[in-house]
Each structure stands twice: as C-alpha cells, then as structure tokens.
Design a protein with these regions (language model features):
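N-terminal secretory signal peptides and thylakoid transit peptides that target proteins
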Residues: 1-15
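Beta-lactamase-like hydrolase cores
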Residues: 20-71, 319-322
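Active-site-adjacent helix/loop patches that line small-molecule binding or acyl-intermediate pockets
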Residues: 26-30, 106, 121-201, 217-218, ...
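Structured C-terminal helix/loop/strand segments within mature extracytoplasmic catalytic/sensor domains
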Residues: 26-34, 212-328
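Bacterial peptidoglycan biogenesis and beta-lactam-recognition machinery
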Residues: 40, 44, 85-99, 150-156, ...
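Second-shell loop/turn segments in exported
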Residues: 64-71, 115-121, 129-133, 141-146, ...
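Active-site SXXK
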Residues: 71-102, 292
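Short, glycine/proline-biased beta-turn/loop segments that scaffold the active-site neighborhood
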Residues: 90-122
C-alpha cells in the first residue's frame, strides 16, 4: 500500500471559477496577493479568509470555491478533538484528561503513527497524551484511540448539529485505509490485515461517500471561528484545554509567520493518482482574530508529487505573509 503522508496533497478536477469579496484597508491589494499566490497550482483549490470587523477595522472576507467539499486528511482531527472535549466538558476537565487511560494495542494500531509506533508499544496512555500525539504529530493510532473514546457517530452528530454539512469523518483511520484498499470488511479491518496489504493498490478514491476525511473551506472557517471562541463548550476550562492542544498543531511551524497565536491542524494525503493538502487555522494577531482555510486536491500519477507540495507551501507562506502584513 502506498504511504499515507501528513505532508501530502490531493486532487481532482479543473480549477473552478471563484467568487471574491474583500473589505478593509488595502482590501483589493490583499485579495490579489492572497488569491494570486495560489494561481497556477493544479487540480481544485479552495480558500477562505475571514477577519470579523472590529471597533476600528472593517470586515475582511476573501473566498474562492469555498463551498466545495474536498479531501482534507488529518485536518478532521480538530473535529474529533472538539467533540471529545465537549463530552468531557467540566471545570475539572484537565484532571479527567490525565486520569482517563486509553488502551494502546492491536485494536487501535494504524499506519503513520510516529509516536505510538505500532506494533512496538502496548499498554495504556492518558487521554491527554493521545490527544497531544494526534494533533502535534498527527499520529493515526492516537487518532483512533480518541475517536473510539468519542464515538464516530457522536462526531458526525456534532458536525450535523453545527451545520457543517460538507464535513465527513471515517469510522477510524484504519477503516479508511481498509476502504481505500477495497477490503469488504473495512469496518473491522485489523492491524494484521493492514500490514499484509502493504503492497496492494488503492482501488477507491480518498474522496468518496463511504469512508472519507472531507470538508470545505466554508465549514473549516466556521468551525474554527466558533470552536476557538468557546461556542461548543460550556466551561472556560474546557476551552483552555482545547486551545492548548490545538496550539500544538504540526503545521503551525511549517507555514505560519512568527508573531501571532495560531491554532491549527493541517492534513494531507499522497497516494498514486490522488493528492491533497489542507491548512485551516484561527489566528490572533495584533489584537484581532482571523480565520483561514486553504485546500488543494489534485491528480498526479506518481505516489508523491514533491514539486506541487513545495509550490503549495510557498503559496501558503506568501498568502499568510500578506495577511499578517495587512493585520499588523
């Protein structure tokens, strides 16, 4: 099986026409710089930037193809984190996180797990440790541990209740891989079966209607704008824990300039013929919040496409640099 990569990219289709609104000082210039940074990239791209109006600054809104559902890979892990913390929402949530032991064994082992390193580690770990591994290192075994604790149906119920209709999560990362490989029993796909499938081809597209990791730029901006402000939590202590974990996101040091408080979890995939990159975030900069999502899905025959990945990251850094300059 082709490697699943947190740093990959995904694709599909021609670039769609875009709709843009931009308001605020330098709005038209910012629009050109942000959208222009991504011009020429292959496949389908989507972007949204929203900075709510403040007492002294008008709203900034820039969108491109923001309502289209695309593959976002591990960026769905922020949904899982949020729902699980909602379930634990209480003034003593920090104690609950450190006191909840989660099983680390073959029932949850998955590929691309650099922290829990299956099959070499077994036992129990605290739920906090699993959450941090899921966000900081995008560990898929940790993800399946937290997803099991939350319940995939509960995560889907949360997304539906929040109006995030373009967002979808699988039963587990391992079930997702089983479906990609065409396993008839993908919902009960075992670690042994996954290991035995190492050289088998991908037969189902990562973006599908059965087991996928998907969202839209609209949904991601809505989710980040609401979750980091505490809309989904009843207790301030839970919001603190959510922000603490999300501030560990592995994409932050890869893409974002210094100077802001960033809460983000990126995602991607690289398989032969299909690639994706997604970076959503909430950023507090110069006493102002902005919310951002940039997604690209594309097709390339090779298992990896480092040239397009490098172009996307350069575009992302240029766009974020322009946004930081505008808000600072």
């Amino acid at each position: 099986m082709q490697a699943f990569s947190r740093r990959g990219v995904i694709g599909g289709g021609a670039v769609a026409p875009f709709a843009v609104q931009a308001r605020g000082g330098g709005g038209e210039s910012l629009r050109r710089r942000v959208l222009g940074a991504f011009r020429g990239l292959p496949g389908t791209r989507a972007l949204k930037l929203w900075a709510p109006a403040t007492a002294s600054e008008p709203e900034i809104l820039i969108t491109e193809n923001a309502d289209q559902q695309l593959f976002i890979g591990s960026a769905i892990k922020s949904f899982i984190l949020c729902e699980r913390l909602r379930q634990l929402d209480a003034p003593d949530v920090a104690t609950k996180l450190t006191g909840n032991p989660l099983a680390l064994d073959a029932s949850v082992w998955s590929v691309d797990s650099t922290i829990f390193n299956p099959p070499n580690l077994t036992g129990t770990v605290s739920e906090r440790t699993a959450m941090e591994a899921m966000i900081l290192h995008s560990d898929n075994t940790a993800t399946d541990m937290v997803m099991r604790a939350a319940g995939p149906a509960k995560v889907r119920d949360f997304l539906a209740a929040a109006g995030l209709a373009a967002s979808a999560v699988p039963e587990s990362t391992r079930s997702f891989f089983g479906y990609l490989l065409g396993a008839p029993d993908y919902l009960t796909f075992t670690w042994a079966e996954l290991v035995a499938s190492a050289d088998k081809p991908i037969v189902n597209s990562p973006l599908n209607e059965v087991q996928t990791l998907a969202s839209s730029a609209d949904d991601l901006v809505s989710f980040y704008a609401r979750s980091v402000q505490g809309e989904f939590f009843g207790q301030p202590e839970t919001l603190t824990q959510y922000r603490n974990v999300l501030a560990l996101g592995d994409v932050i040091r890869l893409a974002f300039p210094l100077g802001g408080s960033v809460f983000a979890k990126g995602g991607s995939i690289d398989v032969a013929g299909f690639h994706a990159l997604c970076v959503p975030a909430a950023v507090f900069l110069n006493r102002r919040w902005f919310y951002f999502a940039a997604i690209i899905n594309w097709y390339a025959k090779a298992e990896t496409d480092p040239q397009t990945v490098a172009r996307y990251l350069a575009a992302l850094q240029a766009a974020l640099g322009a946004i930081y300059e505008e808000i600072q």
